[in-house]
Amino acid sequence: MIKTLQNTLKQDKERFTVPKSVQDIIPIRRIWPDGVFQFGSKYSKTLRFSDINYAIASKEDKTAMFLSYSELLNALDTGSTTKITINNKRLDRRNFEQEILIPPKGDDLDGGRKEYNAMLLDKVTDSSNSVVQERYITLSVHKKNVEEARAFFDRTVHDASSRLNHMDSRCEELDAADRLHILHDFYRVGEESEFRFDLRENMKNGRSFKDAICPDSMEFKKDHFIMGGKYGRVLFLKEYASYIKDSMINELTSLNRSLMLSIDIIPVPTDEAVREMQNRLLGVETNVTNWQRRQNANNNFSAVVPYDLEQQRKETREMLDDLTTRDQRMMFAVVTLVHLADSKEELDSDTETLQSIARKHLCQLTTLNWQQADGLVTALPLGLRRIDALRTLTTEALAVLIPFKAQEIWDRGGVYYGQNAISKNLIVADRKQLLNGNAFILGVSGSGKSFSAKKEMVSLALSTDDDIIIIDPESEYRPLVEGLGGQVINISATSPNHINAMDMEQGYGDGENPVVLKSEFLLSLCEQLIGAGKLSAKEKSVIDRCTAQVYRDYIRSGYHGAVPTLQDFHAELLRQPEKEAQDVALAIELFTDGSLNTFAKPTNVDTNARILCYDIRDLGKQLLPVGMLVVLDSIFNRIIRNRGLKRNTWIYIDEIYLLFQHEYSANFLFTLWKRMRKYQACGTGISQNIEDLLQSHTARTMLANSEFLIMLNQAATDREELARLLNISDNQLSYITNVDSGRGLIKCGSAIVPFVDSFPRHTRLYQMMTTRPSDLVA
């Protein structure tokens, strides 16, 4: 027998004692606050790691993930054992409600909150997502004392964490309370929210930590156990196919039941493994030689070596070759699975389902008879292994049992965006936690772009005090804005509503000279009015001088009193002696004193509403470029004011490609986009014309640098552009190809997750958000 395996089996051997209480069934002897558990001379430590997008990755990406996981297995320390666990745990309903449901505030929006909460509860009461998955890696080692064990864990935990992080899997060490919480949720299914544990308080009162997690009763039968009011069964993988698909573990853990699947791994030093395989090969060759000698003695000189001997020789040579030339390691492994049910009948049915999945992969998943207690301890993420049905595998063969499936997005306090199309779990993201909170919502007409944006607005309006500002070129947001108690400002040449293009808040310029920044804005405005590139150097100097003179008294008064207007600016130009000043004044007269002077008068609308919509549908071709600049500058003023109040601002720009058709509004938006995070703001661009959008270098840069994207159904050319820009695989592209409204991909930071979303149509919120003619008629 291999020395490492022999030592491990010897060290793991424990003296059996008959348990006198339910607490005695839990084999933990001692715990420390940092999460180190002791069992005899063995110590263990557990990490929790997140899932990654393996199921929908491209073939090349899957290969890269597989190789990275193989490297993790190869790096396992030969002096320890490792357990990789997938935990299907029941969703903690009370904790879920605290994290995502919106509490009432006693205002006019409580009706909307009630509808929104009902929608969320419908999503999680659906049987397909009442279970959530967690993944753990438990390292265990035999040491003389806890100090030696901690020194070992400091090294190995850091190495495992860094390798998992390299695979984009977030990793965290679990402390004692975290580990006990996992055990509590398993032993006491249905009581997840009742876990309370304080190690110091327990020590002070002389209570055992086992009292906080143990079930009320535990009874072990031949092929199952009864725990509290639940039935459970432990299975193990007895027979392995010659070729196993990498989806088997995912399929086994897709059962919507409380279950844990664990893979115990004992790595073998390469020199021992090579020596063992050389001895095995020598034994096989000896058997072949003896067989041939017997045939020769019978004068049978042309006999062919029997198939079974030839196969033994071939497999042994292949494994020896793997160990010596392909950087493979020898591992001993055992796969155990424990699942729970409400009744014996349900348990038997679930067992048959699991066994049929294994049979589909030509493997045999067998019940542990008379070993249910040992199997349970082995399946839980404790660090113990009491099942000796070990299988010899290479790194590559073991890596096929890969524990990854689909990346999840769940940010505490975030916004609900839909359900993961693979796992059916809710997607909850907080854009403010990203490197920047800027976003784009992209899709063909009818794919649900506006609805996705409105749904986010509704969530923010109901759950936060943040400000929401919308630029609406199609006049479609009025029902929602007014329904949420906001204000819509119609802007056109004939509208009585006016926004002063020269409004300036205190703090404009972010510490820089505000007049300089406003001068740049007015230069852009004048060039937009007169024509790009038509302002001479002298005219620019005159504009800069007049800007400073117009604002002098206003700034000296501490930004109090009447704010200058474009009409004041026009009058100041006329007072200048230079001919260039008169030329500029004449050129902009149409927009200051003429029929298009809607932005040349004092602001006469309330731009302080918490939810504000600028309706620019009727601006007209001549006023649109100027109107875009003025509205963006007005929004910039609002963002500055909100930053002083420590209030977040959310900006939504529908049909954003319109802004990129005009150089100055595009440049102003680009500058604003870069500053959003600094000003506690998040910008969202909405567009269906992606090909046109990406023709602008400015738009392409903004899109590439936005951390959050919602991609709905896309046209063929747009899909190709997005795939190149965002490195989206063909498998992922299938989720934005000829799909129904409300389906697509969400890019959140580095994660790209397929999603599906639907909203109950009978609700008032839906009627406020929908733009479908059939819904509106109804």
Language-model region placement:
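Conserved lysine of the Walker
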Residues: 449
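Hydrophobic anchor at the beta1->P-loop junction of P-loop NTPases
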Residues: 441
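A short helix-turn-beta junction within AAA+ P-loop NTPase domains corresponding to the substrate/partner-engaging
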Residues: 485-489, 698-711
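Post-Walker A helix-loop "phosphate-sensing" segment adjacent to the P-loop in P-loop NTPases
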Residues: 459-469
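Extended, folded cores of ATP/NTP-driven motor/assembly subunits in large transport
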Residues: 1-404
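Conserved P-loop NTPase
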Residues: 726-778
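P-loop NTPase motor domains
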Residues: 52, 59-78, 89, 253, ...
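Hydrophobic positions on the alpha1 helix immediately C-terminal to the Walker A/P-loop
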Residues: 452
